[in-house]
């Protein structure tokens, strides 16, 4: 058993359905413990978190193995340069205080699936530059949506995740934070049937 501490910084894409708690539930099923905290604000960009200062102060207090960064959902598409600047600023603080950076690669909106390529490229580029881990949630979403119609991953607004969408994202954290495969974890998603869980786990495993 291993214990990992992770600070999640983002917005409703992380807060909706409590993604950190879903990751912790999956980790527990593999015999690991995830101690987590979340700093979130609706629609927030990483720059907004930088300007507010709470996130940096929390990192500076120490005790984190990982800091997970989730950018505003369309900024990497519209302005990858600004996104990369935001990540660099956070990564410097994260490294200085002994933690590692994980980038939560998010998904395209339901009406603009073609934008996933730009999202993926933007996250991968800054991940490669900094040696940061990339959690490939958006890639897993893209793979799942290409093969399955149900369960729905997008909520009614076409942007935010359903429980299934958040669960799929959570599965993508296991290989990064714990070097564990999500395949075969049972009873890990109340509200989703076993067949749906198996399909979601398979998409996450394939994306890694």
Question: Where do the PLM segments sit?
Answer:
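Conserved SGNH/GDSL esterase-like catalytic core that processes O-acyl groups on lipids
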Residues: 4-7, 13-88, 93-95
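Short strand->helix junction
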Residues: 12-13, 109
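Exposed alpha-helical structural elements
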Residues: 18, 54, 118, 122, ...
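Alpha-helical cap/lid subdomain in secreted, periplasmic
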Residues: 56-167, 171-176, 180-184
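Conserved catalytic region of serine esterases and O-acyltransferases that act on ester linkages
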Residues: 160, 171-208
């Amino acid at each position: 058993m291993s214990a990992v501490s992770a600070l999640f910084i983002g917005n409703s894409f992380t807060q909706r359905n409590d993604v950190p708690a879903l990751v912790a539930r999956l980790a527990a099923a593999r015999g690991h413990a995830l101690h987590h905290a979340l700093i979130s604000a609706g629609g927030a960009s990483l720059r907004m978190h930088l300007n507010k200062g709470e996130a940096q102060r929390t990192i500076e207090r120490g005790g984190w193995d990982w800091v997970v960064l989730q950018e505003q959902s369309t900024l990497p598409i519209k302005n990858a340069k600004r996104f990369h600047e935001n990540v660099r600023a956070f990564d410097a603080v994260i490294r200085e205080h002994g933690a590692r950076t994980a980038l939560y690669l998010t998904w395209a909106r339901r009406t603009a699936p073609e934008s996933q390529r730009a999202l993926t490229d933007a996250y991968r580029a800054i991940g490669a530059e900094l040696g940061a881990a990339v959690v490939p949630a958006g890639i897993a979403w893209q793979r799942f949506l290409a093969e399955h119609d149900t369960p729905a991953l997008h909520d009614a607004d076409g942007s935010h995740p359903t429980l299934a969408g958040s669960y799929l994202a959570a599965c993508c954290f296991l290989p990064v934070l714990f070097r564990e495969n999500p395949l075969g974890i049972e009873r890990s998603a109340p509200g989703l049937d076993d067949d749906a869980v198996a399909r979601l786990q398979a998409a996450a495993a394939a994306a890694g």
